[in-house]
């Protein structure tokens, strides 16, 4: 078993993808958000340090083989207004990841971030990251993968995955997974038949834009979004990229038409669209926290496929 340390662990999606292979076990994790930590601890038994990573002392972290880091992407994402390293809140958090890498020298590093990381600041941000990893002894491969093409999950979600090896042979052996057919549909992810809690449904008295929704949402085969002035139908029959602000209502929330009415996705359905298994526990938290956690998370089957290839490359 290869041992994992997980930074910015969130609810544990990256950890879960690695553990599902049967080749890796998480020995230590860190997460700052107290609500995400509640979800993490409902599903994982390993040690979780709930603190700002800047307060973590390297000597307090046990030895491990693989470092996972989904360092916060708000400063690199379109949703986060493209600030990058100047962003005091999260731009410097890559360097906190680097601090642990330099101190602990794991065999493998796995980083996940938004696709925009590559183009941010004319490629300079990514260049800094790439060169920092390389100059500290890692051979790097990276690729942007879409969940619908590489995870058999009907969500349009592109993310960059960066894998680094200290061993040049392992690096040469490693390839990202090949595309695979999408066999799961939106209907596999959502519950169209049951009447759910009233709070998920849009009604005339609760929703100022109810009548255009009613007029334009004609199919139960797809997902819609309210885009400030009009209803957008997703023609590709996959869910649009889930975001951390889904639970706040209004703009961009994925909506479905069911026989019981028009409603937004439930937190569980959002986790389904991230490829979490049915037995993944969602604790009794306010839905806004769970929506945020799902939107900030990763597509677990994509992670699992990359993790399998990492393990095979080290044999």
UniProtKB/Swiss-Prot annotation:
Coiled coil: none annotated. The gene is bsp6IM. Residues 2-315 form the SAM-dependent MTase C5-type domain. The active site is at residue 73. Its EC number is 2.1.1.37. Belongs to the class I-like SAM-binding methyltransferase superfamily. C5-methyltransferase family. GO terms for biological process: DNA restriction-modification system; methylation. A methylase that recognizes the double-stranded sequence 5'-GCNGC-3', methylates C-? on both strands, and protects the DNA from cleavage by the Bsp6I endonuclease. It comes from the Bacteria. It catalyses: a 2'-deoxycytidine in DNA + S-adenosyl-L-methionine = a 5-methyl-2'-deoxycytidine in DNA + S-adenosyl-L-homocysteine + H(+). This is Type II methyltransferase M.Bsp6I. GO terms for molecular function: DNA (cytosine-5-)-methyltransferase activity; DNA binding. Keywords: DNA-binding, Methyltransferase, Plasmid, Restriction system, S-adenosyl-L-methionine, Transferase. PANTHER family: TRNA (CYTOSINE(38)-C(5))-METHYLTRANSFERASE. Pfam families: DNA_methylase.
């Amino acid at each position: 078993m290869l041992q994992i340390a997980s930074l910015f662990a969130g609810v544990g999606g990256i950890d879960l993808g690695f553990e599902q292979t049967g080749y890796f076990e998480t020995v230590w994790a860190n997460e700052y958000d107290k609500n995400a930590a509640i979800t993490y601890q409902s599903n994982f038994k390993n040690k979780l340090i709930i603190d700002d990573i800047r307060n973590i002392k390297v000597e307090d972290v046990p030895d491990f083989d693989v470092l996972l880091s989904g360092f916060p992407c708000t400063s690199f994402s379109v949703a986060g207004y493209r600030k990058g390293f100047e962003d005091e809140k999260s731009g410097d958090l890559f360097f906190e990841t680097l601090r642990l890498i330099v101190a602990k020298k794991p065999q493998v590093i796995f980083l996940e971030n938004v696709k925009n990381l590559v183009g941010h600041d004319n490629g300079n941000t990514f260049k800094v990251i790439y060169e920092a990893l390389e100059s500290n002894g890692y051979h790097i491969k990276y690729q942007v993968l879409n969940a619908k093409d590489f995870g058999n999950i009907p969500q349009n979600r592109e993310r960059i995955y960066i894998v680094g090896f200290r061993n040049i042979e392992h690096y040469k052996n490693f390839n990202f997974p090949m595309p695979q057919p999408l066999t799961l549909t939106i209907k596999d992810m959502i519950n169209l038949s049951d009447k759910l809690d009233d709070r998920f449904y849009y009604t005339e008295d609760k929703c100022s834009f109810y009548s255009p929704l009613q007029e334009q949402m004609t199919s139960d085969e797809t997902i819609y979004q309210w885009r400030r002035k009009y209803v957008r139908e997703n023609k590709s029959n996959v869910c649009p990229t889930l975001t951390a602000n889904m639970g706040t209502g209004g703009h961009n929330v994925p909506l479905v038409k069911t026989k019981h009415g028009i409603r937004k996705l439930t937190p569980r359905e959002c986790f389904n669209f991230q490829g979490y298994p049915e037995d993944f526990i969602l604790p009794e938290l306010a839905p806004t926290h769970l929506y945020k956690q799902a939107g900030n998370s990763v597509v677990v089957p994509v992670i699992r496929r990359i993790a399998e290839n990492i393990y095979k490359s080290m044999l």
